[in-house]
């Protein structure tokens, strides 16, 4: 007995039938020698016309008699006897085509009636306004430029499955206006950052993506092999040490926007491949960096969105207001006021409290952790997620800041900050350690931690020490997570929403 077809199988069967029918249509086009023409050049874009002639009435458009040539994807078609309409979407927006056999010819009109949604079409004609007030192109020429073999998703439901949206981003971009808006905002934000940096006399540079020694961050690297050199290499986890070599070389202000790779987990805030901007400026410190970073983020919001007041997950956020500044212990006591100064300086209490909060204090990173590292862990458990408004957390312990300059006034503390907005880290910066002997000692400490089982501890980079031995001026450096910044600006709850092609498991 034949089992009934399940709904999902039925949908697949229907789609296969549609694809088969469209392949037949493509075969007919091939037979005619007109399957994929490549000689059409648009003269206008839909959104430009919609903007330029938004207030033009029917009579004004008739008097102007503007001839246009537009191409795009057919998203909607209504065949109504001797007159038909098609909504066409190009890279800028949508506009309506008005098609009649009298204007395009009976043969073209008959062909048009057989075209499918998703087809790439082109038209020449005159801009006019219909009796219902719709800005349209009265087509005098109409062509099919590319046949769509697969049907678009249902216009009312779109791509309902989130993973399908990520996996088939090309379809998501076609049918989801919000997705297109997100990635346009991303491009505007990055362009704004580049201009901001250029206006501040920073030079954009490119440093290696393959490193002989992973460095510049505490992270687990991806490992590969360089066949020509017969050596193990690592996809970079951060460009920091190369950028600071450039400071040594005399380029006093440098920045790079590029990819980093960390062979770690995937979460709403993490993707193993992500975009960072790092910048370094000689003769600055972490206070200068905080002021500069605040202005940069504010300007990126204005350039991408037109305002510094944004909405994120139902709450308003005003980036025009001064960003807060708190130490780690100040933040803990602000959001968990029951902790006393004495408790926050008690090793046994901190370990017990972290264990109560579910932190595994037996892992290698905690075995020899000092008070500062334990305070940071408690901050991450009690305060970090509460930092909704832009807040610089400052004065990080030296034991978790191996590349940062130690404070001149407080032992064991570095001139370092991390910027949090909506409970997420957006930026990390500090006055750079430029003492080669101190840096070498800290690298050795990191190697000891790695030998003890801490996979994220840093390697000893002898060439970087050699560079510092030539002398590096006092320098401030900062890294900004571009993906997380775009999440903030576009009201996106997960990092996958702002990556065109996020990492996914293989399809079965």
Curated annotation (Swiss-Prot):
Pfam families, per the entry: tRNA-synt_2, tRNA_anti-codon
EC number in record: 6.1.1.6
Localization per record: Cytoplasm
Domain of life: Bacteria
GO cellular component terms given for this protein: cytosol
This protein's record includes keyword Metal-binding: yes
Residues engaged in binding Mg(2+) 1: 418, 425
Binding-site positions, Mg(2+) 2: 425
Alphabetical GO biological process terms: lysyl-tRNA aminoacylation
TM stretches of this protein: none
The protein's assembly and partners: Homodimer.
NCBIfam families to which the protein is assigned, alphabetical: lysS_bact, PRK00484.1
Similarity comment: family membership: Belongs to the class-II aminoacyl-tRNA synthetase family.
PANTHER family assigned: LYSINE--TRNA LIGASE, CHLOROPLASTIC_MITOCHONDRIAL, LYSYL-TRNA SYNTHETASE
Name of the protein this chain belongs to: Lysine--tRNA ligase
